Amino acid sequence: MTHFKNYNNTIDTLKQLGANQLQIKTVTTGDIYEISLETNELYPLMHINPVNAVAQNNQMTLNFQIFIMDLVFPDESNEQEVLSDCLSICNDLIGTLKNGESLYLSNADQGESPAYFTEGDITIEPFTERFDNSVSGWVFTLPIVIENDYNTCIAPQLTTYAGK
């Protein structure tokens, strides 16, 4: 039974949001420099790059860089269109996380609840010719706030006294 979200199901949710967005053809995760753009032939591509986690009272913020990119013709004649389409995809993803009802689907029988949130303004930055092949797109840092009760009763640790 999962009452609170964690890193694994947050990544899985982001991957599913990418898969649900009909323009995105490929979703990848991990360090952006490990992505093999030559082998990923289906574009537009969404890449999820974990940045860090911030522990707070009763919650944790997981920060991710989200890259949305597409191929640009060698003469760059479609670069403006690629940037426009990729920005629209970014807007869709951010809107879903801020307002989307798809995150409110939960399995009440299993004790699950919709516990993903994002807060504040999100800056979306364009990039062109950033990687080895001709891709352009946008990147933004996405803070995902998840509930976390820091329950030490279920932590896999000895319960003997540790202080001196």
Show where each model-derived region lies:
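A short, hydrophobic beta-strand-centered structural micro-motif
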Residues: T39-V51
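Short acidic low-complexity segments
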Residues: T29-T39
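Charged, amphipathic alpha-helical segments and their flanking helix caps
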Residues: M1-T28, N49-K164
